[in-house]
Amino acid sequence: MVREQGFTAHGRGFFIAFVVELALYVLIGAGCIAAGADPVHVVHGALAVFFTLRLLLVLGNFLPSWRARSPKRAEHEIGAAATLAMFIREWWAAVLTYPFLFAFEPWLAPNNPPAGRPHRGLPVVLVPGFFTNRGYLSAWRAHLLRSGYGKVYTLSPEPVFESVERNAGHLARFVDEVLADTGAGQVILIGHSMGGLTIRLYLHRFGGMDKAGLAIAVGSPFGGTVVAAGKERLGPILGQLSHG
């Protein structure tokens, strides 16, 4: 068993945000009910605010990406209906992730795989992207476990706003723990977004080439991303993400 990260700074931040958001719903709702509002309408209003906030989060990523989209071949077009369905699924994923999977990462998204599961092949290490934690890849983890990959480990990036180099060093230590825990000689690395950059740096500067049997990057901004543009002053990692 590898060392559990427990609450990361990211998870603690989202837990506090969840408590504050919940307290605001309760306080404002209680005030509205005391003023004579229908409790059912108050609950509906709170739910509408909750879902709308998650919708705005998705739009904040979707719209810049849509404006900077690359030209597509005709065979890659999915049409308006499929695009809308994809957006709705992303919205629902945001409802589950912000705040639940993020805020409750020690319980809902442990670093270690469940004990006693059958496994085939090399152990798998999942590496989430910027400003996320293990909870973000819970669906990937669950899918791999259902598919017979019982040794799936997940790492939360730390520290959140530091450089990709710091995260790659953190990944190097984590991979060594996984190899010691499983007795395997190599791992499979799967990274999402910034997780792919972290894996690339780990492979080339932290001795990961000999320890990775396979490395997969999904949606990683190797050429930079417009979502990070203009936010470089928030931390060195934003500058790296804006340029790739």
What do the PLM-derived regions correspond to, one by one?
Residues 125-135, 141-244:
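Serine-dependent carboxylesterase/thioesterase catalytic core
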Residues 1-124:
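Flexible, membrane-associating and regulatory peripheral segments of lipid-active enzymes
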